[in-house]
């Protein structure tokens, strides 16, 4: 079920504003992207059950000393994923079989070198909960079909296309390990290619995210993932436009307190992205001067 017109109109309006504001501010946008990498790395790895905290992830990426309890594997997982993110953000790469394999090799180097940059081979099966992914013999053809569908579909709305490809990719699970992290990087590759900023899929919303795959595998229902991608795009645009405007950014809780209004109502609106709120390190924030009456209701 495609994203509805009101959401499309909000994204269109936000993108137009973003495009106008970003002119001549490449250095600020780069700062935002770089500051966001630890949070993005933390969330994507946490979805895959990494035990690293956000603070530990930040220390690893800054080459600072971390607790002896942190495994070498998790150190490489953080560093490698950050490297993949930097590569994705370095240019408008076309999504292809070759690029997907390259990203996977970068992700698993020094972790699982024997499978890095390789699709599952004969006899290599994967199970996600009760779902068993297609046999290795079907990977090349199925991925090729998904890539062709994505590149040739000129009718579907862009967030719907990205959601469908993500569902197809994760349902296929072409790798022995690293499928989720690569899949989420592909989302950002696709967004950057068409001029949108990168997004973060949040670990705290993991259950809802996983429910999107179940809905697709059980009933070919794409609605949940379409909603997740669209709201993530709006949140990313809200964050960047706030910084590009030079706004004084405060916590949403403080904003609600300042105007003596109910915080739960604002949090609900933030989650729906009907107010220009965004998260940093898991905390909802907003422009202090935001005053669009009614949008928080």
What are these regions (language model features)?
Residues 1-177, 181-297:
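FIC/Doc superfamily catalytic core
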């Amino acid at each position: 079920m495609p994203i509805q017109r009101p959401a499309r109109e909000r994204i269109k309006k936000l993108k137009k504003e973003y495009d106008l504001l970003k002119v001549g501010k490449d250095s600020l946008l780069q700062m935002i992207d770089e500051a966001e990498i630890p949070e993005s790395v933390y969330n994507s790895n946490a979805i895959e059950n990494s035990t690293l905290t956000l603070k530990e992830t930040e220390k690893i990426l800054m080459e600072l000393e971390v607790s002896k309890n942190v495994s070498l594997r998790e150190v490489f997982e953080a560093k490698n994923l950050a490297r993949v993110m930097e590569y994705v953000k370095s240019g408008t790469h076309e999504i292809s079989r070759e690029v997907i394999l390259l990203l996977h090799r970068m992700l698993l180097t020094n972790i699982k070198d024997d499978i890095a940059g390789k699709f599952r081979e004969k006899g290599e099966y994967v199970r996600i909960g009760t779902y068993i992914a297609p046999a290795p013999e079907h990977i090349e053809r199925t991925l090729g079909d998904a890539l062709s569908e994505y590149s040739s579909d000129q009718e579907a709305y862009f967030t719907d296309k990205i959601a469908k490809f993500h569902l197809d990719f994760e349902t296929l699970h072409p790798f022995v390990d690293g499928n989720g992290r690569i899949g989420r990087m592909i989302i950002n590759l696709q967004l950057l290619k068409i001029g949108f900023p990168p997004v973060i899929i949040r670990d705290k919303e993991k259950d809802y995210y996983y429910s999107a795959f179940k809905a697709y595998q059980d009933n070919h229902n794409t609605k949940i993932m379409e909603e997740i991608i669209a709201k993530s795009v709006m949140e990313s645009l809200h964050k960047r436009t706030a910084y590009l405007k030079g706004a004084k950014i405060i916590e949403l809780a403080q904003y609600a307190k300042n105007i003596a209004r109910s915080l739960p109502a604002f949090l609900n609106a933030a989650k729906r992205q009907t107010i220009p709120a965004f998260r940093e390190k898991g905390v909802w924030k907003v422009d202090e001067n935001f005053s669009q009456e009614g949008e928080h209701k």
